[in-house]
C-alpha cells in the first residue's frame, strides 16, 4: 500500500513521522511554514535544526515549498504544526483540498481562541473530509531512530482509523485504533500541562513520592474533564492518556517538563521559554484547560495550580502548601 503523503509542519515530531512514513515505503513531502527552513531542508536533504541525529533523509522523503500548487499529487495530508497554527493550516487546506483526500493530525492541544478540540475545528471547516488523530507516548528522536514505539490512531470512522494504522505500522512502530477521538485528544493535550507541573516539582526537589502523586492525581483530573466532554472512561488508562502522561512527566526529552524544571529552579517564565528554545505546548494549553474546566464546572486542582503559577505569578511553594492542606476527602 504505497501512498503519497504531504506533511505540513517540519518540527521534530512532524519530521519523525515523515521519516516513519518513508521507512514504511511511502513517498513523502514535508513543508515548513518558514521559507528559509524549507530551503535548508532542500539544500542539505536533512532537518538538522530539529533532528540533528538524522544525517540524511531517505530517498522517499523530500522537502517541498509550494505544496498548494502540488496538492493533487497527495493521497493524505498529515498536519503536525503547533496547536497555535492548526486552525490556519486547516483553513489553507480548505482552499485546495480535493474530495478524495483525507487528513491525519499529529498536533496536541486545543484551539487557542475558542478552546475547542482540534477535531471540532477540522470538522467545522472541512465537514466532509475524513479526519484521524495520531497520538500517544512518543518522543520524536526515538521514533526517528526507529526505536520501538506504540501509539493510537483515533477517528470517528473506524475504517479510516484502520487505514491510517496500516499506513504507519511496521516492526518498530505499532498503531492501535480507537473511535474515542475526544478522550484521545484530552489526554494528549492536558498531559502537557501536568508535565510542567511535574517539572516544577522536580526543579524544587520534591522527590519521587510527589512525582508519583502528581501523575496519579493528574490522571484523575484528565479523566474528569474528558468524561464531561464526552470521552470514554477506558481511554484514560491507554496509550493516549496514561502512557503519554507517564512519558512526558518523567523524562527531560519533554519540552514541557524541562520548562517546568527551569521554573522550579527559579527561572522566570520568559527565561525558561528562552532556555527551552522551542514550542512549549503546555504553557498555552494550561489557559485552555483552565477555561474549559471552569466552563464545565470540573475541579482540577493541579491544573488550576499550574495555571496560577504560569499566569498569575503565584509562588510554587505557596501553591504546594495550599494543595497539601486542601479539605481531606475520599480518593474517588
Swiss-Prot record:
Protein's organism: Francisella tularensis subsp. tularensis (strain SCHU S4 / Schu 4)
Residues holding NADPH: 13, 34, 108, 140, 255, 279, 281
Principal location listed in the UniProt entry: cytoplasm
UniProt cross-references to SUPFAM superfamilies, sorted A to Z: 6-phosphogluconate dehydrogenase C-terminal domain-like, NAD(P)-binding Rossmann-fold domains
Pathway: Membrane lipid metabolism; glycerophospholipid metabolism
Active-site residue numbers: 191
S-S pairs: none
Originating gene: gpsA
EC number: 1.1.1.94
Protein name: Glycerol-3-phosphate dehydrogenase [NAD(P)+]
Classification lineage: Bacteria, Pseudomonadati, Pseudomonadota, Gammaproteobacteria, Thiotrichales
Family of the protein in this entry: Belongs to the NAD-dependent glycerol-3-phosphate dehydrogenase family.
